[in-house]
């Protein structure tokens, strides 16, 4: 009960923090953390104080870097003469037009577009034939899983204990 009386005696009103205007008299509110400057004036002040030091650093950076070892440029092979290129083009077969991407189910030949499912056997299937038991998949999942487990979990054998 004593706690309740103590709460009743304390004032519960909220006080707004005092607003101080910018020290440069620009009319915006200042922040005590930035020496009572507004954000714009503080950024301008920090930019002006950091600019002399930034001017001296590029002068030092303008010196060319010294290479550790002399660079030796590898000689590129000379291109073959024009006559050889012409004969090579004449003997090369004509380029075959690219075939469009397969976008039909390998089982029912239904158009699947972007909704097709590519199986591990390498074929594309529709939603009905996407499972291996539905399309008679030739991929051996059991041996692939067995090999993956054997590869990822090598057998660890301790050295034989020699007793004297």
Curated annotation (Swiss-Prot):
GO terms for molecular function: DNA binding; ubiquitin-protein transferase activity; zinc ion binding. InterPro entries: AN1-like_Znf, AN1_A20_ZnFinger, Znf_A20, Znf_AN1. Zn(2+) 1 binds at residues 22, 26, 38, 41. The keyword Zinc-finger applies. Residues 48-58 have a biased composition (Low complexity). Induction: By cold, dehydration, salt, submergence, mechanical wounding, heavy metals, and abscisic acid. It comes from Oryza sativa subsp. indica. This is Zinc finger A20 and AN1 domain-containing stress-associated protein 1. A zinc finger (A20-type) spans 16-50. SUPFAM superfamilies: AN1-like Zinc finger, Glucocorticoid receptor-like (DNA-binding domain). Residues 48-81 are annotated as: Disordered. May be involved in environmental stress response. Zn(2+) 2 binds at residues 105, 108, 126, 129. A zinc finger (AN1-type) spans 99-145. One of its GO terms (biological process) is protein ubiquitination. Pfam families: zf-A20 (PF01754), zf-AN1 (PF01428). Keywords: Metal-binding, Stress response, Zinc, Zinc-finger. Gene3D superfamilies: 1.20.5.4770, AN1-like Zinc finger (4.10.1110.10). Zn(2+) 3 binds at residues 119, 121, 135, 137.
